[in-house]
Curated annotation (Swiss-Prot):
This is Protein lin-54 homolog. The keyword NAD does not apply. Residues 513-626 form the CRC domain. Zn(2+) 3 binds at residues 524, 538, 543, 546. Zn(2+) 6 binds at residues 598, 612, 618, 621. Residues 515-528, 591-604 are annotated as: DNA-binding. One of its GO terms (molecular function) is DNA binding. Zn(2+) 5 binds at residues 591, 605, 612, 616. It comes from Xenopus tropicalis. The lineage of its organism: Eukaryota, Metazoa, Chordata, Craniata, Vertebrata. One of its GO terms (cellular component) is nucleus. Component of the DREAM complex, a multiprotein complex that can both act as a transcription activator or repressor depending on the context. Specifically recognizes the consensus motif 5'-TTYRAA-3' in target DNA.
């Protein structure tokens, strides 16, 4: 297949090479006619998604395009003068020209160079001068119409062997005699922009005897059938790519095709109608099916037209040769850089993550980030990541299905580094699982522990908590994080064991949980809040407008930072442990209370449930052993805790009883399969029972019984009446109970 040389591509104007033409309502249709001798039909190959292809042999086919008159943004009007160069001069009268009404403002080109075809747009049809090239019947004929907006002439370069020297004025279609050998003309119709962005391309076979003018008719046409193909486009159009480049091949041989079929495949946005009519026959409507690219089945391939868009502003198209397609995915390889730490922003997460980025030093290491491709490989064996030995305690949640690997940290001189080996796909990660999947079973992990997920997990990446946070487990699913003063400091979470209720249980007060806080105006973000001071989240507390929870993690971290700015040792334990053998704790430093009497929670001694000592610098202290105020407050605190426990137990018992009542099976509604006893207590039965009771009362009165004896006799009679009703219900299920008193 011969491809048009690069000189032709260079001569083509910019409008042809442009694909991003913005047209608002442009329904213009482009038609390109290519003719070659001794060929009845030529298949067409294109890269477009939809093709309209109509072919016929030996029949006169005329293509009419119906479109609405819409306003275009280009506002160009005028005519297009089509000229071509014949392969050789011929004495027989044969020429063709096509006049298309376009819009104005076109530039004309000077005299064409040898081997070129110049297409100029003129203002009116009368401007077709006598200098137009003559199209001979044995040559190739190219008719180009409606190429969108175009203000420059179109220059086509043909081989020198096909260029003739004869130039005859052509203003109309000349008469074609029947003795001339008919030519095969391919009419390629390229639709303009449509709403779906896919142009329509159609091709039909014509002969030179089938192109006539309105004034002259050929006798040959009187015996031939005429087929009319109409394509209506009324749907609103949008901007899209247009045909930019044509690669036209010469016919390999002049043998006619053995099979000739007509295949139509198109899809218009507005549902156009495609009709094919013959003179003397009723019109037939053909529905247009939305199918893929099809071509004319033929035994031999002679002509091929490959159409490919070029210079697309949004994407680059690479041609495929021999059926080899380019891959549909791209791999992004990170640049080689020193090991560093990058902060990861996870949407919707309250925690801060740090990703350890590897340097691409090894040649066989796998990039840490790739775009998802069609083939994915599971993770290989997870290799350890060595980090610096900073005093950090991490409690990391994992899913039970994953494997946990503990890595002993080693001291390094640099910051966080990663040890890479020769095995590919080495990664360590902490899975970002939701809070509902956090398991409180990793409280005894050493400082600096790094967890690796099982191979085959989805999101792969490093997630390491910063050093200024220490995680704590609260109840069963919450994670409490307390800020650290620095890398060398320790927190209360490392020195005090934690319990399930309210987060913390101190070693001395292990018999009871910490009392709930009662903060009202501090938002639980002050140091005198027990929960906040001990690095806990509030749970089962009596506080109002609490911000010491996961929902307000940002405000909580700001408060922690403010406290650390004022006092770097704010979250350190205020009361240290005593020596071995001593039961009482000692002060790390004394309190400095002045007006609270050391009976408030912001007093270190009172908060730790110990008395003030000589180290304290408090004024008006009441926190000593014989202080009645201290005893009263302690008793009140104990009573409050007991009351809370009792209320919790009562609520739990009540809820369990309610659940038992709801789940208890209902008693059977039928007694022996019949009516229930109370259904027999009708109005008549009630009246008869009352009469029996009155009769029993009269009998007791005649016997001069006492009041108590009379009441006893009446109650006994009432019991006998009820037993009769019950017995009657058991015997007669449908009949009413007859009672005789």
């Amino acid at each position: 297949m011969d491809v048009v040389s690069t000189d032709v591509n260079n001569v083509l104007p910019d409008e042809i090479m442009e694909t991003g033409i913005s047209l608002v309502d442009d329904d213009s249709i482009e038609a390109i006619t290519i003719s070659s001798p001794m060929v009845d039909e030529a298949p067409m190959e294109t890269e477009l998604e939809r093709i309209v292809e109509v072919s016929s042999s030996g029949e006169c086919v005329s293509t009419a395009v119906v479109k609405e008159a819409v306003a275009s943004t280009s506002n160009n009007a005028g005519h297009l003068a089509v000229v071509s160069v014949a392969s050789k001069p011929e004495s027989g009268p044969s020429a063709a020209a096509m006049k298309t009404v376009l819009q104005t403002h076109f530039h004309k080109l000077a005299t064409p160079i040898s081997g070129q075809v110049v297409l100029n747009k003129v203002s009116q049809a009368s401007d077709l001068t006598a200098g137009s090239h003559v199209v001979k019947q044995e040559g190739q004929k190219l008719i180009v119409t409606t190429l969108g907006k175009s203000s420059h002439p179109i220059v086509l370069t043909l081989p020198q062997s096909h260029i003739g020297n004869a130039q005859t004025p052509v203003t109309h279609v000349q008469r074609i005699e029947s003795k001339v050998t008919p030519q095969q003309i391919k009419l390629v119709t390229i639709g303009g922009n449509r709403s779906d962005g896919n142009p329509v391309l159609g091709m039909s076979a014509l002969t030179s005897a089938q192109i006539i003018s309105p004034s002259t008719k050929s006798p040959v046409l009187q015996t031939q059938q005429i087929k009319t193909l109409q394509i209506a486009k009324k749907a609103p159009t949008s901007s899209g790519p247009v045909i930019t480049k044509l690669i036209i091949a010469k016919p390999l041989n002049s043998k006619p095709l053995t099979e000739q079929t007509t295949q139509i495949a198109s899809s218009f946005a507005g549902g156009p109608a495609l009709s094919q009519t013959n003179p003397g026959t009723p019109p037939k409507a053909l529905n247009i099916a939305d199918i893929g690219v099809i071509g004319t089945p033929s035994a031999k391939t002679t002509n091929k037209i490959a159409i490919s868009p070029l210079k697309s502003p949004s994407k680059g198209v690479k041609s495929s040769v021999g059926g080899i397609n380019t891959p549909q995915f791209k791999t992004i390889i990170p640049l080689a850089a020193a090991p560093n730490v990058q902060q990861i922003q996870v949407p919707g997460s309250k925690f801060h993550y740090v990703r350890l980025v590897t340097a691409s030093t090894a040649s066989n290491t796998t990039p840490s980030s790739q775009i998802q491709s069609t083939s994915t490989q599971p993770l290989q064996q997870a290799k350890p990541v060595v980090v610096n030995a900073t005093p950090v305690r991490m409690s990391v949640p994992i899913i039970p299905a994953q494997t946990v690997k503990q890595v002993v940290p080693k001291p390094l001189n640099a910051a966080s580094q990663i040890v890479t080996t020769s095995q590919p796909q080495q990664r360590l990660l902490m899975p970002a699982t939701p809070l509902a999947q956090i398991q409180p079973s990793l409280t005894n992990l050493p400082a600096g522990t790094v967890l690796a997920s099982a191979p085959g997990t989805g999101n792969v990446g490093y997630a390491v908590l910063p050093a200024q946070y220490v995680t704590q487990l609260q109840q069963s699913s919450y994670v409490s994080i307390a800020s650290n003063a620095g890398l060398s400091g320790t927190t209360a979470a490392q020195n005090q064991p934690r319990g399930p209720l309210n987060g913390i249980i101190s070693s001395e007060s292990a018999s009871r949980p910490r009392k709930p806080c009662n903060c009202t105006k501090s938002l639980c973000l002050k140091l005198y809040c027990d929960c906040f001071a001990n690095g806990e989240f509030c749970n089962n507390c009596n506080c109002t407008n609490c911000y010491n929870n996961l929902e307000h993690e940002n405000e909580r971290q700001k408060a922690i930072k403010a406290c650390l700015d004022r006092n770097p040792e704010a979250f350190k334990p205020k009361i240290g442990k005593g020596k071995e053998g001593e039961s009482d704790r000692r002060h790390s430093k004394g309190c400095n209370c002045k007006r609270s009497g050391c009976l408030k929670n912001y007093c270190e001694c009172y908060e730790a449930k110990i008395m003030c000592s000589s180290i304290c610098k408090c004024i008006g202290c009441k926190n000593f052993e014989e202080s009645p105020e201290r005893k009263t407050l302690m008793h009140l605190a104990d009573a409050a805790e007991v009351r809370v426990q009792q209320q919790t137990a009562a609520k739990t018992k009540l809820s369990s009883q309610i659940s038992d009542l709801l789940t208890r099976p209902a008693p059977p509604m039928n007694s022996g399969g019949g009516k229930l006893p109370f259904t027999f207590v009708t109005k008549e039965v009630a009246e008869a029972t009352c009469e029996c009771l009155l009769a029993q009362a009269e009998q007791a009165e005649k016997q001069l019984k006492s009041k108590a004896a009379t009441e006893r006799m009446i109650l006994e009679e009432f019991g006998r009446c009820l037993m009769r009703v019950i017995n009657s219900a058991g015997k007669a299920k449908t009949d009413p109970c007859p009672m005789s008193c």
